[in-house]
Amino acid sequence: MSQSVINEAAISAPAETAAALSFKQGEKIVYENNKLHKRLCRQVGQAIGDFNMIEDGDKIMVCLSGGKDSYALLDILMTLRERAPIKFDIVAVNLDQKQPNFPEHILPAYLKQLDIPFHIENQDTYSIVKRLIPEGKTTCSLCSRLRRGILYRVADELGATKIALGHHRDDIMETFFLNMFFGAKIKGMPPKLQSDDGKHIVIRPLAYVKEADTERYAQIKNFPIIPCDLCGSQENLQRKQIKNMLREWEKKHPGRVDNIFSSLSTVVPSHLMDSNLFGFADLQATGVAMPNGDIAFDEEPCSTGSTISSVIPLRTED
């Protein structure tokens, strides 16, 4: 059948056919949206279970910035609370730092619709940061420290037992490489930690969630997003480099980023070089074979028939 005949048939197709196609497309969209919601609930639930993030009787203070990730976190936690076998409370908290053009009406209006407890903390940290940081320099580090101290105080005042942040899997990966490349440390962003003041437990329930999923979920739910650049701070170029690197890896080498993320939970201290984590100095041969022990001279992990051709030969002396 020629293309012209197909085109004519399509043009003359009854309205019912177009309506049927539109209905099927709508069904597919609904299906995909539901699948995304189920995946987010499953991943957040798994993270909560794996790291014992939420316990019976907890009061979770969800830090809501107005960005896609914190909105998604609050939404999914509210869903899981209805299904959970334990009882826990949620209170949403936003810190209004008095940044220029901050739409202070958006979050209260949104939270009132949800009918959950919330608190808006008004603190002019913006003026402090602008006074102390030279023009053109990034203000994120100082702003973060000020914000952290305020949120710890608010958690105490509200009686919160856990502080929930909206960092996702991509944030964790980026932080890991930032610390490695620019800080010379093997250090990431843990899913659960004790705060630096020793008084609070901070949790990151989105630890297993990809940023692409929170972006799509925010579009589906039509969250009232508040821009994150109202302070006028310069973008963190180092983090941007890492983000671009990971995206390029994911594009060129599918599965690589997944493997790196999995490696964060399968660390072997005896095969690194930190004497604080493993007692190299006191290591002695016991004379007892270890069934799961490693051999001293490991074979090259990629020396298979399929990769022999990619091995670079050593230069021979003339």
UniProtKB/Swiss-Prot annotation:
Residue ranges annotated as motif PP-loop motif: 65-70
Pathway: tRNA modification
Gene3D superfamilies: HUPs
Keyword set includes Transferase: yes
Pfam families, sorted: ATP_bind_3 (PF01171)
Molecular function per GO: 4 iron, 4 sulfur cluster binding; ATP binding; magnesium ion binding; sulfurtransferase activity; tRNA binding
Biological-process GO terms, alphabetical: tRNA thio-modification
Cofactor details (free text): Binds 1 [4Fe-4S] cluster per subunit. The cluster is chelated by three Cys residues, the fourth Fe has a free coordination site that may bind a sulfur atom transferred from the persulfide of IscS.
Amino acids binding [4Fe-4S] cluster: C140, C143, C231
UniProt keyword annotation of Phosphoprotein present: no
GO cellular component: cytoplasm
Stated role: Catalyzes the ATP-dependent 2-thiolation of cytidine in position 32 of tRNA, to form 2-thiocytidine (s(2)C32). The sulfur atoms are provided by the cysteine/cysteine desulfurase (IscS) system.
HAMAP family according to UniProt: TtcA
Family: Belongs to the TtcA family.
Protein name per Swiss-Prot or TrEMBL: tRNA-cytidine(32) 2-sulfurtransferase
Gene label: ttcA
